[in-house]
Regions:
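N-terminal secretory/targeting leader peptides
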Residues: 2-3, 9-13, 18, 27-121, ...
């Protein structure tokens, strides 16, 4: 499909939605629009549906939700831009990588080896360690991080199998757009490149790249196993995916609905995180049993971590995230 034409129709649809939402509110019927890149089976979509369910429960009055799935309104970076502008998308789950324009420290909380395990990550969230980043994003982007989903463990999938650091040398791998991902993967000896998430499949198929990295749910949903049938269990990152809400939208809503949204988002984030973290192994085992994916133990994970940690520490200094990184490391 012609990319410019596709983008035109997507933006046109978003513009129409923005006008329609305003009209509905003016008539007194509140309708909120959400967006997900994935279908009903993905944990992100399920998390947003849980959010909607909880809002209705806590608000106790009529409120309508329209959740646009399967990238109908673009990708996560588009959702964040729409929420920043107060149009088209009121709520979505978005990768911190797409928030770096407004807060340099945002992608750091989703970087490789920042969290030791799920227990540490859950404590970081519960203790409010990430609040300074959320506050900066709210101030500069007017997008509120009201809950924290994620919990998926990211590993490398590729056209070839390997089990040690020698195998990843010069590996042409797609990484997320935040600079910390390029720097850490280069430090480990790989050849990272940034391309759109929606182009990863074609990128491997055409030989532009030979690998990517993702959580189990993403590998299954995007069918990356078809082009990268070997999944090396590097377990190099645990994802954090905030449930975001447009500040411009929230301020236009009744106070009791605002309170319900805040409470529901926090609970839905915890719920989605548990769902995603608990389904990782079962998804990968299922794909392997079906002959779609080969799980390959990675024997030098500690060496990979050691190669990346100096870059993480230096980057934390550059972006003013030293205090946050220190607090994360202090949590056992």
């Amino acid at each position: 499909m012609d990319i410019s034409r596709s983008k035109f129709f997507r933006l046109a649809s978003a513009a129409l939605l923005a006008g329609w939402c305003t009209t509905v509110w003016a008539q007194g019927t509140i309708t909120l629009h959400g967006a997900s890149q994935f279908n009903d089976e993905h944990p992100f979509t399920k998390g947003l549906m849980k959010f909607e369910e909880l809002v209705k429960k806590y608000y106790g009055k009529p409120v309508n939700f329209v959740l646009h799935k399967n990238s109908e309104l673009g990708l996560e970076k588009d959702y964040f831009a729409y929420m920043n502008q107060g149009i088209s998308v009121d709520y979505a789950i978005v990768s911190p990588a797409h928030m770096s324009t407004f807060a340099k420290a945002a992608p750091f909380i989703d970087a490789p080896f920042v969290f030791r395990d799920h227990d540490q990550m859950n404590k970081v969230i519960a203790q409010g360690v990430l609040n300074p980043i959320a506050d900066e994003i709210a101030k500069k982007a007017d997008v509120l991080l009201l809950g924290y989903g994620g919990g998926g463990v990211r590993s490398i999938f590729a056209t070839k199998a390997f089990s040690d650091m020698a195998g990843i040398k010069n590996l042409k791998i797609r990484v997320q757009g935040a600079p910390i991902w390029t720097r850490t993967f280069k430090a480990a000896g790989m050849a990272p490149t940034v391309i759109a998430y929606s182009e990863v499949y074609n990128g491997i198929q055409t030989g532009v790249i030979e690998a990517g990295e993702n959580e189990a749910a993403g590998v299954e949903q995007m069918k990356f196993y078809e082009v990268g049938p070997n999944l090396m269990q590097t377990r190099h990152a645990i994802s954090i995916r905030p449930i975001c809400f447009s500040g411009k939208t929230l301020r236009r809503l009744p106070a009791d609905l605002q309170a319900a949204i805040r409470k529901a988002a926090a609970e839905a984030g915890d719920w989605e995180r548990q769902l995603e973290s608990s389904s990782d192994t079962s998804i990968l085992d299922k794909l392997q049993k079906e002959g779609k994916l080969k799980l390959v133990p990675f024997n030098e994970r500690d060496k990979m971590r050691e190669s990346m940690m100096p870059v993480l520490s230096e980057y934390a200094k550059e972006i003013g995230a030293e205090a946050i990184f220190a607090k994360i490391n202090a949590i056992k």
